[in-house]
Amino acid sequence: MTNIRKSHPLMKIINHSFIDLPTPSNISSWWNFGSLLGICLIPQIVTGLFLAMHYTADTTTAFSSVAHICRDVNYGWLIRYTHANGASMFFICLYVHVGRGIYYGSYMFTETWNMGIILLFSVMATAFMGYVLPWGQMSFWGATVITNLLSAIPYIGTSLVEWIWGGFSVDKATLTRFFAFHFILPFIITALTVVHLLFLHETGSNNPSGIDSDSDKIPFHPYYSIKDFMGFLFVFVILLALVLFSPDLLGDPDNYTPANPLNTPPHIKPECYFLFAYAILRSIPNKLGGVLALVLSIVILIIMPLLHTSKQRSMMFRPMSQCLFWILVANLLTLTWIGSQPVEYPYILIGQLSSMLYFTIILILMPLVSMMENKMLKW
């Protein structure tokens, strides 16, 4: 008799995706982050659902409803901080996942890569709208500043901003629609994740060496399911420590002050995981130029396959490219730090240099160094 997991219509799909999936035998722990993201999404949706049961999307009561969740709801503080810090962990995993894709040349699977970029944009939009919901000072001013960037679009900019706001400023209509979108987007993200996996399983996983691994595959379960579980346990312990010992470490103290349109905070900044993009935006004095740089800092990922000039797929055997990659990582960490600093000397200058270096590495240095490595290997 055939095993039920191989014959049942639904179980068969799960079996081919997570149990009997042929997987390269040499993939490292950097490949854990894809499954980690899927696992991170589940508690985000569950905690979000419980928060939505008690939250009210109204400017007069939003702030106090969040305070009510933390004070009066059974384990409300735990649900709220797990949701907030879970988002930070989600983004750390997301950036590592993208970084691994760049390092090992996974972007050569163009459909999977492009689907991943759509997912990245969706997650960023969801996180931004979620940050607005507690209706603290930073929520309100963050929403005002970031949505206002669209006014830089020629001709239609102002109308577009007012259309998004649902009025002439960030107000009740904005909060209501942001809550609606923040609620629905995670389910859209889940659907997009399935499509992302579908494209991945068409080609099979990449591996650290970057060469074809069809001749050397092993089943996903139990080998990689246990390996992924270890990764999940590791992240879960960090998240738990963050939630229970220092829940406000990654938050902003200004968000404990109710939103006040008449009082601007001294330093408006987004969540910690958007600071690198915010630093790139601020480094250009022109508004439209800044917005373009901000969008391009993420959109640049789409052209990664076109910038690949190396004869080897992975950076595993390319030390010069490896050096460039880690300079890029250090540069992004510098940008993250700059984004959290006030707009004054020397931070402005460091931000401008780091932004320039970011685009230079990806657009010019990486393709050039890859070509040099080809020459050195007489390819």
From Swiss-Prot:
Residue positions binding heme b b562: 83, 182
Places the protein is found: Mitochondrion inner membrane
GO terms under biological process: mitochondrial electron transport, ubiquinol to cytochrome c
Gene3D superfamilies: Cytochrome Bc1 Complex, Chain C
UniProt cofactor note: Binds 2 heme b groups non-covalently.
InterPro entries for the chain: Cyt_b/b6_C, Cyt_b/b6_C_sf, Cyt_b/b6_N, Cytb/b6-like_sf, Cytochrome_b, Cytochrome_b_C_euk/bac, Cytochrome_b_N_euk/bac, Di-haem_cyt_TM
GO cellular component: mitochondrial inner membrane; respiratory chain complex III
Highest taxon of the lineage: Eukaryota
Residue positions binding heme b b566: 97, 196
Transmembrane segments: 33-53, 77-98, 113-133, 178-198, 226-246, 288-308, 320-340, 347-367
Keywords: Electron transport, Heme, Iron, Membrane, Metal-binding, Mitochondrion, Mitochondrion inner membrane, Respiratory chain, Transmembrane, Transmembrane helix, Transport, Ubiquinone
Annotated binding of a ubiquinone, by residue: 201
SUPFAM superfamilies in UniProt: a domain/subunit of cytochrome bc1 complex (Ubiquinol-cytochrome c reductase), Transmembrane di-heme cytochromes
Keyword Heme: yes
A Pfam family reported for this protein in Swiss-Prot or TrEMBL: Cytochrome_B
Single annotated GO MF: ubiquinol-cytochrome-c reductase activity
Quaternary structure, from the entry: The cytochrome bc1 complex contains 11 subunits: 3 respiratory subunits (MT-CYB, CYC1 and UQCRFS1), 2 core proteins (UQCRC1 and UQCRC2) and 6 low-molecular weight proteins (UQCRH/QCR6, UQCRB/QCR7, UQCRQ/QCR8, UQCR10/QCR9, UQCR11/QCR10 and a cleavage product of UQCRFS1). This cytochrome bc1 complex then forms a dimer.
Additional free-text comment from the UniProt record: Heme 1 (or BL or b562) is low-potential and absorbs at about 562 nm, and heme 2 (or BH or b566) is high-potential and absorbs at about 566 nm.
Function: Component of the ubiquinol-cytochrome c reductase complex (complex III or cytochrome b-c1 complex) that is part of the mitochondrial respiratory chain. The b-c1 complex mediates electron transfer from ubiquinol to cytochrome c. Contributes to the generation of a proton gradient across the mitochondrial membrane that is then used for ATP synthesis.
Stated family: Belongs to the cytochrome b family.
Protein name: Cytochrome b
Organism of this sequence: Fukomys amatus
